[in-house]
UniProtKB/Swiss-Prot annotation:
InterPro entries recorded: CXXC_Zn-binding_euk
SUPFAM superfamilies in alphabetical order: MAL13P1.257-like
Further comment: Present with 3970 molecules/cell in log phase SD medium.
Annotated disulfide bonds: none
Keyword Transcription found: no
Stated name of the protein: UPF0587 protein YCR090C
Source organism, top-level taxon: Eukaryota
Length: 182
């Protein structure tokens, strides 16, 4: 059963779209706490995973974004990250929202509120990702003035100023959760 990373934040009214900067030239490095599902031991440091790197899985034809062996029980652990939603739109009347709702429903995510963004699906084998750290991610924020800004969260918040409209731009009360889908 796949897991999904769900992000939520309070945005200022002049924000129209938020996405994660994740290209081959500028790869998003997602940081998580990882726990082995066999021995339940928590890995002693954050693991950093991106969607572009692939590693051949031992004794398998598949690949994964991240591989490691649990240092406590020696079990093979793997995580495969896949992009799920490209962007979060603040205007729920946009035609794209109907498609987003359909895709969420197909994956058992219809109860995820519209004020949330689901950037990743997580296929974890032998482990669980239990906490996400947003400080390694660069977000791209589109504003009603047409301006696009890049930001990184500090203490789960970001504040800036849109010179075009003379308004403050904010992303506050950032939270994340990892939920099960189907």
């Amino acid at each position: 059963m796949p897991l999904f990373l769900v992000l939520k934040a309070t945005l200022s009214e002049n924000v129209t779209k938020v996405s994660i900067e994740n290209t081959n030239e500028s790869r998003a490095e997602f940081a998580f706490d990882l726990q082995c599902t066999s021995c339940r031991e928590l890995h002693d440091s954050k693991v950093i995973i991106n969607t572009f790197e692939e590693y051949a899985m031992p004794a398998s034809k598949g690949t994964a974004s991240f591989l490691m062996k649990c240092k406590f029980c020696s079990k093979e652990l793997s995580v495969n990250l896949c992009a799920f939603e490209d962007e979060y739109l603040t205007d729920q009347s946009d035609d794209k929202w109907a498609k987003i709702k359909d895709v969420r429903k197909k994956h058992g995510l219809s109860k995820v509120k519209e004020d949330s963004f689901i950037p990743l699906s997580l296929d974890c084998r032998g482990c669980e990702l239990i906490k996400f750290y947003p400080d390694t991610i660069t977000f791209e924020v589109s504003l009603s003035s047409g301006k696009v800004m890049s930001c990184q969260l500090e203490d789960n918040e970001w504040y800036d100023y849109d010179d075009n409209l003379g308004e403050e731009v904010t992303m506050t009360d950032f939270s994340s959760s990892i939920i099960k889908g189907k």
